[in-house]
Amino acid sequence: MPSTGTLVIIFAIVLILCIMLLFFYKTAEAGKSGVLPPPIPPPTPPPPKKKYDHNEYMEKTDLEPEVKKNHRKWANEAEHLISSSVKGLENLDETAFLANHKGHGFRTFDHAKSLFKEFLKKY
């Protein structure tokens, strides 16, 4: 019967051969195509949002025919009035503003001036 030292050496050699065989098997397997996991696909982009179609919206609404026909013209007129009044306010003199609003809840002249300046900043 072989001695203990010889058995340990034989066991170590067998263990090293098994590890080498396992390593060789893994590297050979990794070289094959199709063994690696498939690549992660790129994220799919969200579906495109449907563009707002005003004419389609107006067809679906149950407005009177006159409103459906003239709503765009009325909206343009209102927008023009608002923009022109805001432009007029930008050129308005502070004294005219205060004269028109005298006695309408302003505590002092400075309070009225500060409110007027805040109003102009908003528009």
From Swiss-Prot:
It is a single-pass membrane protein. Its main location: host cell. Residues 32-53 are annotated as: Disordered. GO terms for cellular component: host cell membrane; membrane; virion component. Signal peptide: none annotated. It is found in: Host membrane; Virion. Induction: Expressed in the late phase of the viral replicative cycle. Keywords: Host membrane, Late protein, Membrane, Transmembrane, Transmembrane helix, Virion. Residues 36-47 have a biased composition (Pro residues). It comes from the Viruses. The chain crosses the membrane at residues 5-25. Belongs to the asfivirus CP123L family. This is Uncharacterized protein CP123L.
